[in-house]
């Protein structure tokens, strides 16, 4: 089933309709309120005052998504050391996120955007008629809630290091 999903996703990825417009760098990040893998509610305002890496991904338990999540997991202490938080978002439900998080021991919040409202607000919702997913894109949000970086072309193998490097560069530039 996962192989079929991956094949369909790859085959039809260029045909997906894009729902909303992506907010530009320098604009306030669209707000959100969703449940995490443990059923706890999270709001963008909860992260005010903190650097935030928000990564959208298509589907729990699929190869690229698992690679990306595990890379964030393996580098979570580096994010924490510089005062940044990581939040993953997909259209999967809370139960799916719980299984995914437990299986791979993910130590960060994964939010369930079941209706695709947040993915739409960030311009990453893709509608393939049979399924809707969030495309693999990420955003860096500064402590004031402003988008400072948008990653449109994400490689699950290297993305975490790219985000960490960009965060460190931005933070050190602010301290000068």
Task: Give the location of each predicted region.
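Short active-site neighborhood of thiol/selenol oxidoreductases, capturing the structured segment around
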Residues: 45-66
């Amino acid at each position: 089933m996962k192989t079929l999903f991956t094949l369909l996703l790859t085959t039809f990825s260029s045909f997906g309709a894009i729902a909303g417009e992506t907010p530009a760098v320098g604009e306030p990040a669209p707000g959100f309120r969703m449940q995490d893998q443990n059923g706890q509610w999270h709001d963008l305002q909860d992260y005010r005052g903190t650097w935030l890496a928000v990564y959208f991904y298509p589907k729990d338990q699929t190869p690229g998504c698992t690679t990306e999540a595990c890379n964030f997991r393996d580098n979570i202490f580096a994010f924490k050391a510089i005062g940044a938080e990581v939040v993953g978002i997909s259209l999967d439900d809370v139960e799916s996120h719980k299984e995914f998080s437990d299986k791979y021991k993910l130590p960060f919040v994964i939010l369930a955007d079941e209706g695709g409202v947040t993915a739409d607000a960030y311009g990453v919702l893709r509608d393939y008629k049979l399924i809707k997913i969030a495309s693999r894109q990420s955003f860096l949000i500064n402590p004031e809630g402003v988008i400072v970086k948008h990653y449109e072309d994400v490689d699950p193998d290297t993305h975490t290091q790219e985000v960490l490097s960009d965060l460190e560069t931005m933070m050190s530039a602010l301290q000068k």
